[in-house]
Amino acid sequence: MSQLATHASPTAVLDRLALVSTVRGAPSLAERLADLDRWVKSDLKDFEAELDALPRGARVVHQAAHHLLDLRGKHLRPLCVALASRFGEGFTPRARSLAVAAELVHSATLLHDDVVDLAERRRGQPTASVVYGNAASIFAGDWLLISALRRIRTSGVEGVLDRMLTVIDEMIVAESVQLERRGKISGAREDYFAIIEGKTAALFRWAMIAGARSADLPVASEAALERFGFHLGVAFQAVDDELDYKDNTGKDPLADLREGKVTFPLVVAIERDPALRPRLEELLAHETVEADQLAPIAQAVRASGALQATRALAEDHVQRALNALDELPAGAPRDALVTVALASLERQS
């Protein structure tokens, strides 16, 4: 059974934030983020230097890859590696290499996704597929994937290569399910959770495992960090689904809806308003969908309260992530992961 089958109170994370602020004497989230930035700045600087050392050249595959890498994402997965490693030996060279690998795998999936989805914008700029073409973007993703696997192998950290191969397999299966189910409404909730477990949560889990193993943490600590990564990944995807219905995010608004992807807001809206289902099925039966056709569906989704339900899903899994951290020793690394989890609810892109 999916780990997502049951849910805690959607308001629990708000209670947890109050607990962090009062009982533990934590500062505001803004102050926590400032502390986090100061604490990990050196680690992230070292990570970015190693990422920038990836070969550049005249070959279009390198140019397409660096087109995306140079746009600088949130680097949340590498941050997870770094923070997990801080429970033990710290952000050593082998931990740093694994952090770079996590970012390369993530970037490879974005390059491939933008081709599959015919996306035109990524991080507020034209996608690599628009600038360099679909073939170059696909080969660039392949190159980043091979570069990541090579780094993992040479890191010498036991077990992380096999785990990454499993993650990649899970990603491919999830993408296949999403492709097969595109535009199909039946079984939407079950399919949704199967897809995000493979597409998003799996790599977050790996990042936490990689950081833990690079620092030789006990098995129990690794397991707690893996659970944190899983729930953080689910929360991250839920927020991403919510942002599809907002402007000024650096992505095309309603892109998921236009591509026929049945995300959580759509799942909830269809469950709450059955009359929406035939309208949506008719719309998604067309190969291309115009913006004026999307607007009424988006309005119905918003009116159903589905965005609030999606926010509640994200809050629920942030709460679960925080619960996992209770099994780890108190200190700066745990506080930093609390901040990362809480901040994931507030992101705007």
How would you describe each model-predicted region?
Residues 1-107, 111, 115-130, 166, ...:
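Conserved N-terminal diphosphate/IPP-binding helix and adjacent helical/loop segment
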